[in-house]
Amino acid sequence: MHPHDQTIFALSSGRLPSAIAIVRLSGPHAGAALQMLAGKMPAPRLVTRALLRDPQGEPIDDAVVLWFPAPASATGENVVELHIHGSRAVIATLFGVLSETPELRPAEPGEFTRRAFENGKLDLTEAEGLDDLIHADTDRQRRQALRQLKGLLGDKVRRWREQIIEAAALIEAGIDFSDEGDVPAELLAPALSRVQQLLLEIEAVLAAQGRAERLRDGLTVVIAGPPNAGKSTLMNQLARREVAIVSPQAGTTRDLIEVQLDLDGYPVTVIDTAGIRETDDPVEQEGVRRARDRAAHADLVLWLSEHDGAEVERQGETPLWLVRTKTDLDGAERATRPDTKASRTFGISARSGAGMGALLDALVGFARNFFGSTESGLITRERQRQSLRQTADALQRSLDTVDLGEELVAEELRIAALALGRLLGRVDVEDLLDVIFREFCIGK
């Protein structure tokens, strides 16, 4: 049996218990399942109240039901939504009835979205945008995901693909109808001009790809420094909750502690690390090793010090700010050594809050510069970048092979069009689909 001959069902709303739960069904037998549960079919796309019953006539729950006949539905199939009370007992009873119904089965993760993709309701870039929207933690991530979900990248790729196919058709028509075998200049010149313009557009998108991808992944800030310098206190201040143990005893933090922050809409992961020092304790040694490793791979290191920063360790080329802590404990302004290798210096008291505003403002400014103008970023995933890179390379080869024969030019354009088709998920991507849609939750 083909998977689409089966009707799937899943809880599409949040964790139970809840005030309302939404159960979604999709497939050829969704309507029959609704008829069985509600006793009658509601009008399409009209909110209808119904008492759901099991096959023995026992009430399950009072519900609001919606019926979306194919193809005018989210998945392109017959779709039913059951809005019921978010009780674990109600859901268990309903799922028991559905599971015992022939040709109905529980949905796999992402299966509703995959069916929508396979039925042409959205392309692969829009499906990835939906996944990004589900996992968005900040407003800027939400806006970026919505742009992709609405087809900003997909529409542009479709237009590029159509223009490449048109250019290839012009060249192939010239080959087919030319007595000498050479494409007439009046056909070749406009085709190559169009290819050159497309190449410039695609290269511009590739040049800006890092911004959107960085916004999706977020900025990593590591808090490092010697033991008892106030790292965990700063971590708690930034998180605005107790996420790290604060103790006057040195070496309290042995492992990495991560917290996700939203700084002016920018996603930031802050990592508290073990105090860096020489030690004979093997557990603490491992903590120090991990601290140095994360600092080397961070986007920014905040090096905390009670003193003048003489003990600063800089890992690689990672930007480093010196943050002098506990300024409320010394009455005089402390000088900073000129050879600390820190690009910026701040003085704070995490306990009193002095200096925290300036540090936060600086972090927001760093994030703004790090992410750049994300409005122009379209590529959020490595898969998308690779497909566009393959397209641009094929277009460049088509321009470079003009003197070797128009057949080679047309072949390179065909390769470019295929790469864009893979980006949209329309050709040669079957192996990717399971990987992509497994990232979705069940019920989506």
UniProtKB/Swiss-Prot annotation:
EC code(s) of this entry: 3.6.-.-
PROSITE patterns per record: G_TRME
Gene Ontology molecular functions: GTP binding; GTPase activity; metal ion binding
Family per record: Belongs to the TRAFAC class TrmE-Era-EngA-EngB-Septin-like GTPase superfamily. TrmE GTPase family.
Name the UniProt record assigns to this protein: tRNA modification GTPase MnmE
Keyword Iron: no
Annotated TrmE-type G domain residues: 218-368
Quaternary state and interactors: Homodimer. Heterotetramer of two MnmE and two MnmG subunits.
UniProt keywords, alphabetically: Cytoplasm, GTP-binding, Hydrolase, Magnesium, Metal-binding, Nucleotide-binding, Potassium, tRNA processing
A Pfam family that the UniProt record links to this protein: MnmE_helical
Binding locations of GTP: 228-233, 247-253, 272-275, 349-351
Swiss-Prot/TrEMBL cofactor(s): K(+)
Top-level division of the source organism's lineage: Bacteria
SUPFAM superfamilies for this protein: P-loop containing nucleoside triphosphate hydrolases, TrmE connector domain
Function (record text): Exhibits a very high intrinsic GTPase hydrolysis rate. Involved in the addition of a carboxymethylaminomethyl (cmnm) group at the wobble position (U34) of certain tRNAs, forming tRNA-cmnm(5)s(2)U34.
Localization annotation: Cytoplasm
Major localisation: cytoplasm
GO biological process, alphabetically ordered: tRNA methylation; tRNA wobble uridine modification
Residues bound to (6S)-5-formyl-5,6,7,8-tetrahydrofolate: R24, E81, K121, K444
Binding site for Mg(2+): S232, T253
Assigned GO CC terms: cytoplasm
Cofactor, how bound (note): Binds 1 potassium ion per subunit.
Enzyme class: hydrolase
